[in-house]
Amino acid sequence: MKKVLFGLFALSTVAMAAETNLYLRAGADLNGEYDVINYEGTKVNKDEADDFSWEIAVEATREIYLKVELGLGLAYQKHGDAKSAFNHEVYGENEWDDTTLEMAGYTSIPLYIVAKYNFDAINNFVPYIKANLGYSFNDGDGDFKMSGLSEDGTLEGEVKGNVKIDDGLYYGIGAGFEYNNFTMDLMYQVNEAEAEVTVSELDVKTKKDYDYSRVTLSFGYKFNF
């Protein structure tokens, strides 16, 4: 909550200035991918995101030079969980065959600088390019789970592990257009993170990169103040 309040305070400071553009955006990820976590040769997850991923954002900018806007942005980004990894053999006190490994996804709240360049209008359409750079505050959405199946397909056992997601860099680059204050753009975005997975029952602890990257299609509206 403190992170959100700090971001809103920073945005409001920019928005109170004269000749400010305030953008509200909502978007959906087209092809989300996670870094694959490997532990001693075993893949904990697949790289594809399994669930629908979306975001909402607010950005306040000012024109600092002809056609050039600079400002701050704050977003709430709900990343889908990574797809489960299957068919591993795990040996320990217990033994599972055809093991399913489930790795939790995470939610990000990035606070970032946004830079935007507007090209000349074409029939009321204003093409633009933009770039974001900031810091992503990340929060894990669940536990690590490992479950095994017996030969007849019944659940034989399940082990859960704690997942801690560290914060990291956020950046994005893309292009779009504005028409009568409505906007549409495509952005390639990356939230950097590290995941620390602890499975006390198996005496396992590992920390690996767990970045989330994707192309996001967004629609929005610009308010002029």
Model-derived segments and spans:
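Transmembrane beta-strands of outer-membrane beta-barrel pores
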Residues: 26-34, 74-80, 107-109, 119, ...
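Predominantly the C-terminal beta-signal and adjacent terminal strand-loop region
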Residues: 33-37, 79-83, 171-225
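Residues that define the transmembrane beta-barrel architecture of outer-membrane proteins
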Residues: 50-56, 105-111, 125, 165-171, ...
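Membrane-embedded beta-strand positions of outer-membrane beta-barrel proteins
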Residues: 22-26, 70-74, 113-115, 129-133, ...
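Cleavable N-terminal export/targeting peptides
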Residues: 1-21, 225
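Short glycine/proline- and aromatic-enriched beta-strand/turn motifs that initiate or cap beta-hairpins
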Residues: 17-62, 140, 214-216, 222-224
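Outer-membrane beta-barrel translocator domains and adjoining extracellular loop/strand segments
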Residues: 34-43, 82-95, 139-156, 194-204
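Outer-membrane beta-barrel channels and translocator barrels
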Residues: 18-20, 63-67, 120-124, 179-182, ...
